């Protein structure tokens, strides 16, 4: 007989109970939230006295910054400003291209007018 006997030998574990008998695991997330009331709202936290809220995949300051303007509003205005600057740059480029095209056609027109005048002069000399 061993010194410690069968005290240290692992015993067989009892078989596990079957999986959950409820059908909640087969429901989609929104239905489960309605059934179980799992609507937690948006996550918020405080860091160094500043309140942050998780919106659209980013942590956004929930508090109002100096001057009474909301941080989300300033972000929206910056984004709109950048869009307008890009549009303005595109329009300037289009104007430059149109001016180049106009100067090219004007130069061609002047050359053709000059050539036509020369042909008229040579035609008069022949007569």
Curated annotation (Swiss-Prot):
Which stretches of sequence are listed as region Leucine-zipper?
77-98
Checking PANTHER family in the record gives: LEUCINE-RICH PROTEIN (PTHR21533), PROTEIN CHIBBY HOMOLOG 1 (PTHR21533:SF20)
Q: What is the lineage of its organism?
A: Eukaryota, Metazoa, Chordata, Craniata, Vertebrata
Q: Which residues form a coiled coil?
A: 68-110
Q: Does the keyword rRNA processing apply?
A: no
Cite the residue spans of the region called Minimal region for the interaction with PKD2: 60-112
Protein name, UniProt field: Protein chibby homolog 1
Location in or out of the cell: Nucleus speckle; Cytoplasm, Cytoskeleton, Cilium basal body; Cytoplasm, Cytoskeleton, Microtubule organizing center, Centrosome, Centriole; Golgi apparatus
